[in-house]
Regions:
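Membrane-interfacial terminal anchoring regions of lipid-handling membrane enzymes
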Residues: 1-179
């Protein structure tokens, strides 16, 4: 318990309007689902540099509340594996709570799920802007990669924060651990 208290764990979240490595991530996932993905030399460094240098749109930084003594004491009362899981879960909740959802996230969620669930969060111009951006990004990938698989993963990259926030709300409402 004392060790965790000494750490003074303060969860943070950074939310980007535009994921700078969206198409690289989608491409890698599509390839890795078909066969073992082998990164080219320097690919990791290139991804890091893209993540730093590429456009991100608006950025939201949230510095969460530190883990409480009660949360740490609760975790400390568990066996070693459960202790770390409880701490991880408490940190995850704070990170997700602090995550800002952007219009792109809601647009992608609705497109991916063929719904209008979050249509009050954006307008038609936002949809057109996101779809145009997505199609442009998809056009940068070699044509032999399945475009529909690529599109689905691309949409999921932007939609998943909405799904995660929904799970957080369900978890708060039910008390069941979903995350």
């Amino acid at each position: 318990q004392q060790n965790f208290e000494e750490l003074n764990i303060v969860p943070m979240s950074i939310s980007y309007e535009i994921e700078p490595c969206d198409i690289q991530k989608a491409r890698e996932l599509v390839i890795s689902r078909k066969h073992k993905y082998v990164k080219a030399e320097g690919e990791d460094l290139n991804s890091i540099m893209s993540g730093i240098m590429k456009q991100k749109g608006n950025i939201h930084l949230n510095i969460g509340k530190p883990l409480t003594a009660e949360e740490i004491a609760d975790a400390a009362s568990c066996d070693k594996n459960d202790r770390y899981q409880k701490i991880r879960h408490a940190v995850d909740l704070r990170v997700i709570e602090g995550y800002k959802l952007w219009k792109n996230n809601y647009v992608a969620y609705d497109i991916a799920n063929h719904s209008f669930k979050y249509s009050d969060k954006y307008d038609q111009a936002d949809v057109e802007k996101f779809v145009s951006y997505m199609e442009h990004q998809l056009d940068t990938v070699e044509p032999e990669i399945n475009r529909e698989d690529l599109r689905r993963i691309f949409l999921d990259i932007y939609a998943n924060p909405v799904v995660t926030k929904e799970l957080l709300e369900k978890e708060k409402a039910t008390g069941a651990i979903l995350l």
